[in-house]
Amino acid sequence: MIQAPRIALIAGEASGDHLGAGLIQQLRLHFPTAEFIGIGGDMMRSAGCQTWFDTTELAVMGLTEVLRHLPRLLKIRREFCKRALAWHPDVLIGIDAPDFNLTVERWFKQRHIRTVHYVSPSIWAWREKRAAKIGASVDRVLCLFPMEPPIYARYGIDARFVGHPMADEIPYQTDRATARTALGLPLLSPVLAVLPGSRHSEISQLGNTFLEAAGQLSEHLPGLHVVIPAANTQCKPLLAEQLSRSTLPVMHSHLLDSSARTAMLAADVVLVASGTATLEAMLLKRPMVVAYKVAPLTYRIVKTLKLLKINRFALPNILAGEDLAPELIQKDCTAPALCAALLHWFKHPQKVTALQNRYLQLHTQLRRNASTRAAEAIAELLQQR
């Protein structure tokens, strides 16, 4: 029975650093004298992990960025593997970032070291056969969504549903008034939150259309306030430029530095790009309209090759197995269509109440004390040695 395990972790993104810190805190309850090393950020270091590389050194996005940084990424991988193997870990835990982590995990598994992958890739959406590669790389997968373990079971892979950390963080009942006060918004006016994505390419595709829809909505809802949280400093100038060309009243338009959660909390309705933000809006119990648009050639390739297995894009709809939030994709993503879908929520409060009750059911399903369950699954694996 291992009393003081050596645990290596790799968090390739800021969200992974957050997950890693919570996991370390819970693992210490099982193993008070455990040692932790790895790749992480400030939160993991504060939790007691000795980091050999920082999470920011792995955080590159897009094919061209990856290619430009590939030599450095490969060097980090080589150095980490060499040092970690010499350190003799009892388990290696890769947190999300599958492009980097699965290769490292497989390398360690081949050397008879237990490996765990925390946060399953979206095999339920596309490229399900990746599950076989994942199974060759890890001893156990820790999943955030309940529909994931049954897919792994078809491939004979040990996968556990631990719940979603965001569902643990967000309370069942949320406070709109406090959020509005924090943003300087009137308590009784209609408020729309606009989130066209976090990447430059997403905002280029969706930003103008979203703002045009908000402008049209303001004609139906006098006194409408629109809050636009910039996901990061890189995308704020583009949003500011798009906003300057929109028809939105200047006095009622609010471009924010980050604060996406506060913006959604303050809003009556959310207009959001398909992605993780839809899950956050659901957990905050906000009615939403979901949209997405990619380059026409990309969309044709995806459709022709049948790369996507799903007929729904928004996470709340996928989790519910029904269309709770309107989805407007590609050619259907027009300002008039978005405006009409948004106006529907503003004009039908009884439907909003019914929707919020359904969102509460999904929230309850996802709230499982994820860090606690993940730590239990890892502790169990360690005791099997």
Curated annotation (Swiss-Prot):
<comment type="function">
    <text>Condensation of UDP-2,3-diacylglucosamine and 2,3-diacylglucosamine-1-phosphate to form lipid A disaccharide, a precursor of lipid A, a phosphorylated glycolipid that anchors the lipopolysaccharide to the outer membrane of the cell.</text>
</comment>
<keyword id="KW-0441">Lipid A biosynthesis</keyword>
<dbReference type="Pfam" id="PF02684">
    <property type="entry name" value="LpxB"/>
</dbReference>
<protein>
    <recommendedName>
        <fullName>Lipid-A-disaccharide synthase</fullName>
        <ecNumber>2.4.1.182</ecNumber>
    </recommendedName>
</protein>
<dbReference type="GO" id="GO:0008915">
    <property type="term" value="F:lipid-A-disaccharide synthase activity"/>
</dbReference>
<dbReference type="InterPro" id="IPR003835">
    <property type="entry name" value="Glyco_trans_19"/>
</dbReference>
<comment type="similarity">
    <text>Belongs to the LpxB family.</text>
</comment>
<keyword id="KW-0444">Lipid biosynthesis</keyword>
<dbReference type="GO" id="GO:0016020">
    <property type="term" value="C:membrane"/>
</dbReference>
<dbReference type="GO" id="GO:0005543">
    <property type="term" value="F:phospholipid binding"/>
</dbReference>
<dbReference type="GO" id="GO:0009245">
    <property type="term" value="P:lipid A biosynthetic process"/>
</dbReference>
<comment type="pathway">
    <text>Bacterial outer membrane biogenesis; LPS lipid A biosynthesis.</text>
</comment>
<keyword id="KW-0328">Glycosyltransferase</keyword>
<keyword id="KW-0808">Transferase</keyword>
<keyword id="KW-0443">Lipid metabolism</keyword>
